[in-house]
Amino acid sequence: MEENKQRVKSMINILQLVAPGTPLREGIDNVLRAQTGGLIVLGYNEQIKSIVDGGFHINCAFSPASLYELAKMDGALILNETGSKILIANAQLVPDPSIDSIETGMRHRTAERVAKQTASLVVAISQRRNVITLYQGNLRYTLKDIGVILTKANQAIQTLEKYKAVWNDGITNLGILEFEEVVTMSEVVHVLHSVEMVLRIKNEIVSYIHELGTEGRLIRLQLTELLADLEAEAALLIKDYYQEKTQDHHQILKKLQDLANTQLLEDSDLVKLLGYPGQMSLEESVTPRGYRIASKISRVPPLIIENLINRFKTLQGVCRATINELDDVEGIGEVRAKKIREGLKRIQEHLYMSRHN
């Protein structure tokens, strides 16, 4: 899993460097339109120095126009790691020929071998096929047309909307069952599965946003709006049902996101994520602590909610508490005690109304 996370992180960094709207991407697109082809290496360490033969050491500030003009020469361009300077133009690259390559064209074969030998980012711009290919280490990625990415991103947003609706239905039903004191592990796992799918699609959309650069602003806004409060509520759901009382609910949610990136999760995986044995029966009753529902009561800060749960242990305990008992909790006076009682009643009524709408 760690290796996969590192690959994803590397890919995000690469895509941000060559995303639309960046000077480097503007220069690359100019070369692509001119159909001259090009080979660009980012980074000039000892390993790169050992395979560079000839070329002109120009060490000038990067500009898209400079890249376009210098790419007309047959050799490769060597830039610094951030792409802010052009160090060498018209360089011949001589990587180890024994390194395996799946490419057929000389430019792309050289690019792949250089990337594998040096772990530097290498950009190969095809002369005839209008394709930009990125190489770094064993990573190989072909940049897609912006129109294609936008279409895929919009399709993913529509899919996310559907799973958000599944989450809304599941969390509403769970809330009703919590007030009725009839929650089983099955209902909790069902809601966590919807969280898993939402996080999976979110990760896909985020990768599109990185690749779209400045063209992805609208997609980013839609994603932010769709996920508003969902992840925070999912973290509180975990805090409610984790076997041992925990303050690491955000870390557990992050673990769920990491798992969602790599595999489809079974019911037993989600049960274990909550700290229970994987073979636990899904029909077994579980009791919420009440953090999620209590967070919906207006003007009750997290510290007061913590005091409330510490005193009454469960949501049922809070619901059954009298005004006097609530008043005894640190930070809760008579006025706030009444607001808590009224708030819980309103939340319950709202949940029942939502189910029947």
Curated annotation (Swiss-Prot):
Species whose genome carries this gene: Bacillus mycoides (strain KBAB4) (Bacillus weihenstephanensis)
PROSITE patterns assigned: DAC
Superkingdom per UniProt: Bacteria
Highest classification ranks of the organism: Bacteria, Bacillati, Bacillota, Bacilli, Bacillales
MF-aspect GO terms: adenylate cyclase activity; ATP binding; diadenylate cyclase activity; DNA binding
Catalytic activity: 2 ATP = 3',3'-c-di-AMP + 2 diphosphate
Role noted for this protein: Participates in a DNA-damage check-point that is active prior to asymmetric division when DNA is damaged. DisA forms globular foci that rapidly scan along the chromosomes during sporulation, searching for lesions. When a lesion is present, DisA pauses at the lesion site. This triggers a cellular response that culminates in a temporary block in sporulation initiation. Also has diadenylate cyclase activity, catalyzing the condensation of 2 ATP molecules into cyclic di-AMP (c-di-AMP). c-di-AMP acts as a signaling molecule that couples DNA integrity with progression of sporulation. The rise in c-di-AMP level generated by DisA while scanning the chromosome, operates as a positive signal that advances sporulation; upon encountering a lesion, the DisA focus arrests at the damaged site and halts c-di-AMP synthesis.
Cofactor(s) the record lists: Mg(2+)
The entry's keywords: ATP-binding, DNA damage, DNA repair, DNA-binding, Magnesium, Nucleotide-binding, Nucleotidyltransferase, Transferase
UniProt domain DAC: residue ranges: 8-146
Entry binding sites for ATP: G75, L93, M106, R107, H108, R109, T110
Name the UniProt record assigns to this protein: DNA integrity scanning protein DisA
Quaternary context: Homooctamer.
GO biological process, one term: DNA repair
InterPro entries: DisA, DisA_sf, DNA_integrity_DisA_N_sf, DNA_integrity_scan_DisA_link, DNA_integrity_scan_DisA_N, DNA_integrity_scanning_protein, RuvA_2-like
The EC number(s) this enzyme carries: 2.7.7.85
Family: Belongs to the DisA family.
